[in-house]
């Protein structure tokens, strides 16, 4: 094993010089021991990012560099960072290096470990079949359906409900689907990760889930690589066991943000809005590995933070290009008390075609969107002149659009403690029939408020009865 020594420390970036001819390869993991006094030491892992010349390398630290001194001895492990894979990881919580961070015993030394850097599957190995993944969430299943083995993005600014939606999807899909899930917490709140772990333990889903965290308080190196650690675990289940795996990533923006934090320290010239010039390449390397092959599939659901609600920001804009379906969360809808605050006109899916979802579903979805679009166009007239100035046809459109808008909201299982209402799972067939009935005017006599935060149309009629309306 080659041994070098530290020549410079710049926050999370450390330069190391090796003997001539012993330079470690890019992406290799290096280790060094930090003295903590009283004979205690902690191990720090570095990843080689650049070759500087003069037998020196520039590395990114995976944990805090406090206490690192120039001249400290560094050892090349001769291989990239590797994480445990296989059934032993299920029900467990790991960090970016594959070290356990739960209260369970250490993993057996015989557990297989795979490197986190690898090539994406070859073009001819990719699967092309398109099949719908039912989520039980009306607005998603009707207007922007998810694809099994596809990539799905949940876009939204701060506090519009991305994490709650991802938790509901874990609850619905992981329990209904019964397969294996991997959750990668990338640069998000530790509290949310803790809550999620306990919720999954209570529901029993944890037994089929591996969790990897590199949270907000950790250095950029960990946040930059933890998505790859989670993906490596998912790839094993796909490639070696032929499973259909669910990969949840919360939040993909933090992966980009971590790259941008170290980019300047690595000596790269900043690009648009100060992001790293390698933004598209880094995103591509991650996203191209999240795919379905002829052996098994990885369905990924990724939360994407939108800085200042600006969708033209390079980070969310780069992620858009890789996705099969997008669910856009809109702040205006949260202000109206519509949860999940999914924008029915901005959300998209390449599966919303008659060939995939069927003629009836497609027609109902397009009619719902057309009604909501017409309502949006009429809102300016209503704001200036009031409802009375509209034609009878337009009044009917507005009345139905408002019912549709409220009916697109839904009570979530994971939000029971906030709403006091039981969560609901609505099958796709029922969703299509319910919206078809609203479009046909069968429920024009039911008050708008009865449509808020409910599951199926039966729950609407129940609420209406409670309001004293003849159903």
From Swiss-Prot:
Subcellular location: Cell membrane
List of residues binding ATP: 156-163
UniProt-listed Pfam families: ATP-synt_ab, ATP-synt_ab_N, ATP-synt_VA_C
InterPro entries named in the record: AAA+_ATPase, ATP-synt_VA_C, ATP_synth_F1_bsu, ATPase_a/bsu_AS, ATPase_alpha/beta_chains, ATPase_F1/V1/A1_a/bsu_N, ATPase_F1/V1/A1_a/bsu_N_sf, ATPase_F1/V1/A1_a/bsu_nucl-bd
SMART domains named in the record: AAA
An MF annotation (GO) of this entry: proton-transporting ATP synthase activity, rotational mechanism
Protein topology in the membrane: Peripheral membrane protein
Gene Ontology CC terms, in alphabetical order: plasma membrane; proton-transporting ATP synthase complex
Xref: CDD domains: ATP-synt_F1_beta_C (cd18110), ATP-synt_F1_beta_N (cd18115), F1-ATPase_beta_CD (cd01133)
Presence of the UniProt keyword ATP-binding in the record: yes
Quaternary structure and interacting proteins, as annotated: F-type ATPases have 2 components, CF(1) - the catalytic core - and CF(0) - the membrane proton channel. CF(1) has five subunits: alpha(3), beta(3), gamma(1), delta(1), epsilon(1). CF(0) has three main subunits: a(1), b(2) and c(9-12). The alpha and beta chains form an alternating ring which encloses part of the gamma chain. CF(1) is attached to CF(0) by a central stalk formed by the gamma and epsilon chains, while a peripheral stalk is formed by the delta and b chains.
Protein name as it appears in the record: ATP synthase subunit beta
Source species: Macrococcus caseolyticus (strain JCSC5402)
Lineage of producing organism: Bacteria, Bacillati, Bacillota, Bacilli, Bacillales
Gene name of the record: atpD
């Amino acid at each position: 094993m080659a041994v070098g020594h530290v020549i410079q420390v710049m926050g999370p970036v450390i330069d190391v010089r090796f003997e001539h001819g012993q330079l470690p390869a890019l992406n290799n993991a290096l280790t060094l021991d930090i003295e903590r006094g009283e004979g205690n030491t902690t191990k720090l892992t570095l990843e080689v990012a650049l070759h500087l010349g003069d037998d020196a390398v520039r590395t990114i630290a995976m944990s805090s560099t406090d206490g690192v001194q120039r001249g400290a001895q560094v050892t090349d492990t001769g291989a990239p960072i590797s994480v445990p894979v296989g059934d032993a990881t299920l029900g467990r919580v790991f960090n970016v290096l594959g070290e356990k961070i739960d209260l369970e015993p250490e993993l057996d030394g015989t557990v297989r470990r795979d490197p986190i850097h690898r090539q994406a599957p070859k073009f001819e190995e990719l699967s092309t079949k398109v099949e719908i993944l039912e989520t039980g969430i009306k607005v998603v299943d009707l207007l922007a359906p998810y694809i099994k083995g596809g990539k799905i993005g949940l876009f939204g600014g701060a506090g519009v409900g991305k994490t709650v939606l991802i938790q509901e999807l874990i609850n619905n899909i992981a329990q209904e689907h019964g397969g294996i899930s991997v959750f990668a917490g990338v640069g998000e709140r530790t509290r949310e990760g803790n809550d999620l772990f306990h919720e999954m333990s209570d529901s029993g889903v944890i037994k089929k889930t591996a969790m990897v965290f590199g949270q907000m308080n950790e250095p950029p190196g960990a946040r930059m690589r933890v998505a790859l650690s989670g993906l490596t675990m998912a790839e094993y289940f796909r490639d070696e066991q032929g499973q259909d795996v669910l990969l949840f990533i919360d939040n993909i923006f933090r992966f980009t943000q971590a790259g941008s934090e170290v980019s300047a320290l690595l000596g790269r010239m900043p690009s648009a809005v100060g992001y790293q010039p390698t933004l598209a390449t880094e995103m591509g390397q991650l996203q191209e590995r999240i795919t379905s092959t002829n052996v098994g599939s990885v369905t990924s659901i990724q939360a994407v933070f939108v800085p200042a609600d600006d969708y033209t920001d390079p980070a969310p804009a780069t992620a858009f290009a890789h996705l099969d379906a997008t669910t856009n969360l809109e702040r205006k809808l949260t202000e109206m008390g519509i949860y999940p605050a999914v924008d029915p006109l901005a959300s998209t899916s390449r599966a919303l075609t008659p060939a995939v979802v069927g003629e009836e579903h497609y027609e109902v979805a397009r009619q719902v969107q057309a009604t909501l679009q017409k309502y949006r166009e009429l809102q300016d007239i209503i704001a200036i002149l009031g409802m009375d100035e509209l034609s009878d046809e337009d009044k009917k459109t507005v009345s139905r659009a408002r019912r549709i808008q409220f009916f697109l909201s839904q009570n979530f299982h994971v939000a029971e403690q906030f709403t006091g209402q039981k969560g609901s799972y609505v099958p796709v067939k029922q969703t299509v029939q319910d919206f078809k009935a609203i479009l046909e005017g069968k429920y024009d006599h039911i008050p708008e408020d009865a449509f808020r935060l409910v599951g199926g149309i039966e729950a609407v009629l129940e609420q209406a009865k409670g309001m004293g309306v003849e159903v």
